[in-house]
Amino acid sequence: MSGRLEGKKIVVTAAGQGIGKATAIAFHNEGANVTATDLNDKTLADLNKEYPNINVQKLDSTDNNAILEFVKTLDTVDVLFNAVGFVHHGSILECEDNDWNFSFDVNVKSMYQMCKAILPLMIKQNGGSIINVSSCASSLKGFPNRFVYGTTKGAVIGLTKSI
């Protein structure tokens, strides 16, 4: 642990597994005060068992009221790392309206809601960083069998640039 992030307060969404978990651990190992959120109680409990100094909080990132209540518990946030995501497999012809809506709710709307809720804290403290995880499926080369996933991750890029 280098301590480079000592005293920094970092929120990581979808921290129960994958990129979110690895990022929460990396920030913790650099000395940050990490709050790891996820919808899955078991993966959060496993993370907390392995890293008891990481604060874990169950949070449905698609529930704006839950997000607003969660943010009320925070005094400052130096970094928001939005890792929440869902991969729908299928082409445009295999994408139903409910697949489209669910994917946008998870991959775009949840990030918008987290950014909107946490940004006032960052403005109040005169700084902070927001990192929204996207994918090369959105820009470098389209993936026809991940039609809606690539579309939503393209929207994440636009969202992030527009903040």
PLM feature segments, named:
Residues 135:
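Residue(s) in the substrate-gating loop at a strand-loop-helix junction
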Residues 95, 142-150, 162:
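Active-site loop-to-helix junction immediately N-terminal to the catalytic Tyr of the SDR YXXXK motif
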Residues 91-92, 96-104:
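Substrate-binding pocket helix/loop in short-chain dehydrogenase/reductase
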Residues 84-88:
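Conserved NAD(P)H cofactor-binding loop of Rossmann-fold oxidoreductase domains
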Residues 16-17:
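Conserved glycine-rich cofactor-binding loop
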Residues 58-69, 97:
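The beta1-alpha1 cofactor-binding region of Rossmann-like NAD(H)/NADP(H)-dependent oxidoreductases
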Residues 115, 152, 160:
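Active-site helix of classical SDR
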